[in-house]
């Protein structure tokens, strides 16, 4: 498991750390996910959650822990969450500091099932987040039916935004919608100072990406904040 921080530039604090799957020798997510099948999907999803919580406790992770989950691996939210709740209790990690992100790694075929999971998790006290907003299923149709606590802007939507007026208009419109709905916005995949500056000027305060820190395997990476 690797960890990458999500930073709050208003006070240079850590909003959360995202747990990113890695192989036992540090192999990348693509290598690991290529070995996940329909038969081992559930056990893989459960193992990732437990591993993320165990390492978070060992590393004394500050702030929130963001965990990706696969909707197709969850058949009944109240049953599939038991191992997560038991581990959180065992390592003394408050559930209100756990943020569940809907991952884009698989095709969501049953939107009502996804909505049921998100509503159930929110009812249990977890933070809910939609990853890659603006891509695939993670768009306005989903937002119309469920308003998560957090959305993460799709990396493709913000890539080169400092020199792309169309992307600027789309992101500004998304930010306005989220303000009206009281949804927190995270810009992920930030790699350049230009992208960061453009988004900061639009009012974004939460960022994730190589500009700030690369993921660290079984560790919390040092953070580099751009000059104000």
Predicted ranges, named:
Residues 10-13, 103-108, 137-228:
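EAL-family c-di-GMP phosphodiesterase catalytic domain
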Residues 24-46, 71-79, 90-124, 156-176, ...:
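EAL-type cyclic di-GMP phosphodiesterase domain
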Residues 1-91:
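Bacterial c-di-GMP phosphodiesterase EAL domain
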Residues 122-125, 140-142:
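Glycine-rich phosphate/oxyanion-binding loops and their immediately adjacent helices
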Residues 60-65, 93-98, 124-127, 149, ...:
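Short, well-ordered coil/turn segments that N-cap beta-strands
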């Amino acid at each position: 498991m690797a960890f990458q921080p999500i930073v709050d530039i208003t006070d240079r604090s850590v909003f959360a750390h995202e747990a990113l799957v890695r192989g036992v020798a540090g192999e990348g997510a693509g290598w690991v996910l290529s070995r996940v099948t329909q038969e081992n999907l559930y056990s893989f999803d459960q193992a990732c959650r437990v591993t993320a919580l165990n390492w978070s406790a060992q590393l004394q992770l500050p702030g929130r822990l963001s965990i990706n989950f696969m909707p197709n691996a969850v058949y009944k939210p109240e049953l599939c969450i038991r191992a997560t709740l038991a581990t959180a209790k065992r390592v003394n990690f408050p559930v209100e500091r756990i943020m569940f992100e809907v991952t884009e790694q698989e095709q969501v075929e049953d939107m009502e099932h996804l909505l049921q999971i998100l509503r159930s998790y929110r009812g249990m006290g977890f933070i809910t987040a939609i990853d890659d907003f603006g891509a695939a299923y993670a768009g306005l149709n989903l937002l119309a039916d469920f308003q998560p606590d957090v959305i993460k802007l799709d990396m493709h939507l913000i890539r080169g935004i400092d020199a792309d007026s169309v992307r600027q208009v789309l992101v500004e419109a998304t930010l306005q919608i989220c303000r009206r709905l009281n949804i927190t916005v995270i810009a992920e995949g930030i790699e350049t100072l230009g992208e960061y500056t453009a988004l900061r000027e639009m009012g974004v305060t939460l960022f994730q990406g190589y500009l700030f820190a690369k993921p660290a395997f079984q560790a919390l990476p040092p953070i580099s904040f751009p000059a104000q």
